[in-house]
Amino acid sequence: MVRRLTSPRLEFEAAAIYEYPEHLRSFLNDLPTRPGVYLFHGESDTMPLYIGKSVNIRSRVLSHLRTPDEAAMLRQSRRISWICTAGEIGALLLEARLIKEQQPLFNKRLRRNRQLCALQLNEKRVDVVYAKEVDFSRAPNLFGLFANRRAALQALQTIADEQKLCYGLLGLEPLSRGRACFRSALKRCAGACCGKESHEEHALRLRQSLERLRVVCWPWQGAVALKEQHPEMTQYHIIQNWLWLGAVNSLEEATTLIRTPAGFDHDGYKILCKPLLSGNYEITELDPANDQRAS
């Protein structure tokens, strides 16, 4: 007698479908195994209950049975929809945009942060600057992206503690001219405030410590297209100043999306910085005169 072995994936899917609320099971059969975004809808036609993303929509949706919150969300859901993308980048970008626009009940809120700030190094001085006042995509010597001024100063203080930098010279506390700071007496400051260390050495150590937090300036003159491919789909992500303007199916359609970004997009920067600079994707500069150059 030949015994047929069932794959773990098929066993998981069969069990998951059986455990799913009965009123949602009809939507499960058509779930694609492709990358993209999926939405759980409740009674409202305008506000989804939950928006998620995955490189395999079917597998991810079927796994939504792990916590009491997920079970509560499924009970309130009335239907499931999805949007396929060419890959993980497109799924991440589309998910972030839809969550901001539609504010689903069960998602962590992604709102435009009007207090978004960074540390800016000017010669030997560090200032806290805000994205609403400075173009973070172009401004030089920016380090870290913080939700507010307090978080930025806490990060600077942590670096000062690790590197024995002077709070006074960093503007974290008042400093009397010509006198050592209190932390110097405790050997928590290397003494740039009292001549034990030169200001140049202090500034160099500060810059070296901040380097890991550097905000990369937008390296192109204008918009670019990042090509993302799937066996069943190709997308060109149109990006300018780290802001995702949208996706098109061909470069000829790119000009319909090009516009001047209204501000710095923190989520776009986090998602796009690594893939754009990795060299793993085809990048095409989008010239206003349509002279497109691939790199």
Curated annotation (Swiss-Prot):
It comes from the Bacteria. The keyword RNA-binding does not apply. One of its GO terms (cellular component) is excinuclease repair complex. Induction: Repressed by LexA, induced by DNA damage. It is an enzyme of class 3 (hydrolase). GO terms for biological process: DNA damage response; nucleotide-excision repair; SOS response. Residues 33-108 form the GIY-YIG domain. One of its GO terms (molecular function) is DNA endonuclease activity. PROSITE patterns: GIY_YIG. Its EC number is 3.1.25.-. The keyword ATP-binding does not apply. InterPro entries: GIY-YIG_endonuc, GIY-YIG_endonuc_sf, GIY-YIG_UvrC_Cho, UvrABC_protein_C. Keywords: DNA damage, DNA excision, DNA repair, Excision nuclease, Hydrolase, SOS response. Incises the DNA at the 3' side of a lesion during nucleotide excision repair. Incises the DNA farther away from the lesion than UvrC. Not able to incise the 5' site of a lesion. In vitro, the incision activity of Cho is UvrA and UvrB dependent. When a lesion remains because UvrC is not able to induce the 3' incision, Cho incises the DNA. Then UvrC makes the 5' incision. The combined action of Cho and UvrC broadens the substrate range of nucleotide excision repair. NCBIfam families: PRK10545.1. This is Excinuclease cho. It comes from Escherichia coli (strain K12). The gene is cho.
